[in-house]
Amino acid sequence: MAKLLQSPPKFLPAEWYIANKSQYHRAEAQRSRSERLVAESQRLVEEIEKTTRKSQSDVNKKLEQRLEEVKFWKKELDDKLEHLVNETEDLLTYKIRLERSLESYKEPLHITEKCLAYREKRVGIDLVHDVVDQELQKEADIIHGVMNLLTRTVEEATEQIRLNRSAKYNLEKDLKDKFTAITIDDICFSLNNNSPDIKYSENVVRIEPNSVSLEDWLDFSNTNMQKADKQLNNSMALKTLVDQILSQTANDLRRQCEVVDTAFVNGLKETKDARNKLADHLAKVMDEIASQEKNIEVLENAITQQEGPAKVAHTRLENRTYRPNVELCRDVAQYRLIREVQEIKHNVARLEETLAQAQIQLKALFRRQLALQEEIQVKENTIYIDQVLCMEMRKSIPPRDGDDHGAWEGGIRAEAIC
């Protein structure tokens, strides 16, 4: 207790000086360290502010560059989309042309097949597989081939339109995403330290797991562009093919139509010539019938005219049998009368034989007359079928110029055949 109440120890003056000096030094050292820290802090603040400004400026520049890059690709995609849309609309028009062309071949095919059916109604020897039949069948085969080709081309156009729309969908989706990205980056680019809607966000300093690399991003847009380019090229090639098909088929059908019409004209001329020759022969046969009938009449009259002389000769011979006794002489007159009767009998036999031959010839002429009349009727039937039924019906086939390359009158023109 006594120790606790003792007064504190006293120091020597030297100790006092030393203690004060020590305080001075420690204070000076502390102040110096503090000053260095203040200076370092100021330098650090300035450095960080400069770095922050530089980083923010760099980010702004990168955002601006990114915006320009995305906008560039968006414009490229926009242009490609517009081109693809226009090309698809063109292809739709071409498809309509193909469908109308396909439809327009039905009536000519019907006419050709009907001509073939009509010509099956020819009769007799005229039911021949002639050049007209061959060319009509060839025309029908060509039209069938053209229709099959057009049907396949319509299917190709339909598929190409589907592929174009698929590429269009991909472009539109890419454009939509790029528009959203541009909108977001525009907002980000416009932000500054004084913007009212800036804030801290949790867990944003990260790489999204579903994000893609810049190379993947470029590949994606490039792929969409390449797919669109491929469909554009395919569409343009298909349009060129359609133009060629429509032009070539028009020319083929026009040429074949001309061949068929020429065959009809030539065949009709040949049939008419045959009919006219038959008519000439019929007229000659008719004249010969009249001549033969007159000849028969002359022969019959000649036979009749021999009856008088025959009766006279017979009467003379009979009367001379009544000569008496030696007067019943075989004189010259008697022999001449006998010879006269024999001559008349022989002449009548000759006349009757000639008459029989004339009657046979007349019957043959009548048969020939009937055959010629029937054959002329066969020719008339053929002429009626070819000229009245077929050739008149073929006039309803619309003409085709063969130079259709897609320019339709009034925007859309029905396709013709020949």
From Swiss-Prot:
Modification(s) after translation: Ubiquitinated, leading to its degradation. Deubiquitinated by USP16, promoting its stability.
Subcellular location per the Swiss-Prot or TrEMBL entry: Cytoplasm, Cytoskeleton, Cilium axoneme; Cytoplasm, Cytoskeleton, Flagellum axoneme
Keyword Cytoplasm on entry: yes
Tissues expressed in: Predominantly expressed in testis.
GO annotation terms (biological process): cilium assembly; cilium movement involved in cell motility; flagellated sperm motility
GO CC annotation: axonemal A tubule inner sheath; axonemal microtubule; microtubule cytoskeleton; sperm flagellum
Superkingdom of origin: Eukaryota
PANTHER family (UniProt xref): TEKTIN (PTHR19960), TEKTIN-1 (PTHR19960:SF25)
Record family assignment: Belongs to the tektin family.
Protein's job: Microtubule inner protein (MIP) part of the dynein-decorated doublet microtubules (DMTs) in cilia and flagellar axoneme. Forms filamentous polymers in the walls of ciliary and flagellar microtubules.
Quaternary state and interactors: Microtubule inner protein component of sperm flagellar doublet microtubules.
Record-given protein name: Tektin-1
Origin species: Rattus norvegicus
Organism ancestry: Eukaryota, Metazoa, Chordata, Craniata, Vertebrata
Protein encoded by which gene: Tekt1
